[in-house]
Amino acid sequence: KLLKDMYVQPGLKGTLDIWDMQMVEYGRRIIEKRKRFVEELNEIIQNIHFNLTGGTENLRVIYEPSCPGQELEKTVSENRERDMRMKITSAGPHRDDLCMEVNGIDIRRYGSQGQQRTAALSLKLSEIYIVKRTIKDTPVLLLDDVLSELDSSRQTYLLDSIHDIQTM
């Protein structure tokens, strides 16, 4: 918003260094926390997905930061002029992404619809596990006709996995 407002209020340009410093400081923290979270998530999701697919698929979540945390300050500085022209901030944790690979293949691009749905379900089950462990309470799981999209072995695994979770 600041980059857009600078053209209406030129005095705001003088505050850009302060905002960039804060974005870099907090951005580095966010990037590090996301890295740790994805590592933890992978430990859980790989087991869930392996069981859900009957051992035929290995799922891995890959955190793709727009730039490494240690390079964030340099990248923000190098991109400043272009970012001011474009009125966007092109680097930082708001530009990060997650990739999901099944057996080493990026399923965003090359996965079947079934693989994508199964990976999404594995992600949901992993989230439930992490939330349950973190807050020491069982979350509610909302599923919309998911069983019709799964074969019988995946249905059985899903139902066994969520038997103690309130579902809607």
Question: What does each of the following model-derived ranges do?
Answer:
Residues 4, 166-168:
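Short, intrinsically disordered, charge-balanced linker/junction segments flanking boundaries
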Residues 144-146:
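Walker B catalytic acidic pair
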Residues 9-140, 149-153, 157-160, 164-166:
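Conserved NTPase motor "head" modules and their coupling/switch loops across ABC/AAA+ ATPases, GTPases
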Residues 1-10:
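Phosphate/Mg2+-binding loops and adjacent switch elements
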